Amino acid sequence: MTNIRKTHPLLKIINSSFVDLPAPSSLSSWWNFGSLLGVCLAVQILTGLFLAMHYTSDTATAFNSVTHICRDVNYGWVLRYLHANGASMFFICLYLHVGRGLYYGSYMYSETWNIGILLLFAVMATAFMGYVLPWGQMSFWGATVITNLLSAIPYIGTDLVQWIWGGFSVDKATLTRFFAFHFLFPFIVAALVMVHLLFLHETGSNNPTGIPSDSDMIPFHPYYTIKDILGFLIMLTALSALVLFSPDLLGDPDNYMPANPLNTPPHIKPEWYFLFAYAILRSIPNKLGGVLALVLSILVLAIVPMLHTSKQRSMMFRPLSQCLFWFLVAILLTLTWIGGQPVEYPYVIIGQMASVLYFLTILVFMPLVSIMENHLLKW
C-alpha cells in the first residue's frame, strides 16, 4: 500500500515540499537561512498575537499599555522582548539570505528572486509600522520623518501624507491604522512566502558550485530537516540570550520616553536594520533625490540578474568577484555605522562616498570584473 503522505491531498503537498523534495547534496549552512526566516516569522506572529491581546492603539494609552504588558502581564516582558529582538534576528537572517543569493548566483531564478525582493519590502514596511506602536519619542518622530518623505512625490505628495496620517500630523488616527496594518502584514508575508517556495520548487535549489546538480540529489528528509533543526536551536539560543541578558542592546533609550510632539530628540534615527538605507537617504541633500536613492538601494537588487555577465553562476570559483562582494559588505557596514551618527563632518562625506560606492559596485564594478574574469579564463 502506498504511504498516506503520498496520497492524502494535503499531506502530499507537505511531502513534496519538505519530505521527498530532491535537494542538491552539497548545500552549505548558508542554505539554512530560508528555514530560519520561517521560524522567525512564526515567532513574530505568535508573540505579536499575544501582545495584541493586551495592547491598546490609542495615543493616550499606547505607551502605558506596553508598560502594563512588561510589568503586570505574566511573562509579558518575555513576549515584548522576544518580539522586539525577534525582529532583529529576522533582519539578520534576511540580509544573510539575500547575501547568499548574491554570492552564489541564486538570483538567476528570477521569479523566486523578485518575490524575495517583494518580501523584503513587505517585512521592512511591517517592521517600520511596528516601531511606531509603543508610542515612545523615537516611535513618534520616526513615524513623522519617514511618512513625511512621501511629500517629496510631485503634485500629490502633500495630500498623500495627510491621507496616510488621517489628519494634519501623526496622531491617534495614524497609530490606529498602523496597528491594523502591522497586524495584517505578517499574514500577507506568510502568503508571499508560499509563492516564494512555489517558484523555488519549480526549479529546485541552487548549490554552492552554481553547477546543475540534477544527477546528484538527496531527499530533503532526513538530511536537511536535521540540519535545519540544528539551525533553529542555534538561532533560538542566540535570541534567548539576547532577550534574557541584554534585551535593550539593540533598542533606542529615547523610546522609553512617552511621545512628545513639542520636544524633538537630538538624533532621530530608525532601528539598526534600517540604518544603511537611512544613511543613503541622508547622503543626498535633495528631498526627492534622497527618497529615490532610498527606494533604489533595495530595488537595485531587481536588476542584478540582468547585470550578470559572468559565464559562471556562482562566485565560488571567481576570486576577483569575491573581493568585490566582501567590499560591498564592508560598504554596507560603513553605511550602517554612518546612519547612526549625527549629520556633521566627517560623517556626511563618508556617507556620501559609501553611498556612491554602493551603487557603483553593484551596477558597474561587478559586471566589469565578471567580464574580466571571463577573459582571464579564456571563455
From Swiss-Prot:
This is Cytochrome b. Heme 1 (or BL or b562) is low-potential and absorbs at about 562 nm, and heme 2 (or BH or b566) is high-potential and absorbs at about 566 nm. The keyword Membrane applies. The keyword Membrane applies. It comes from Glossophaga leachii. GO terms for biological process: mitochondrial electron transport, ubiquinol to cytochrome c. The chain crosses the membrane at residues 33-53, 77-98, 113-133, 178-198, 226-246, 288-308, 320-340, 347-367. The lineage of its organism: Eukaryota, Metazoa, Chordata, Craniata, Vertebrata. Heme b b566 binds at H97, H196.
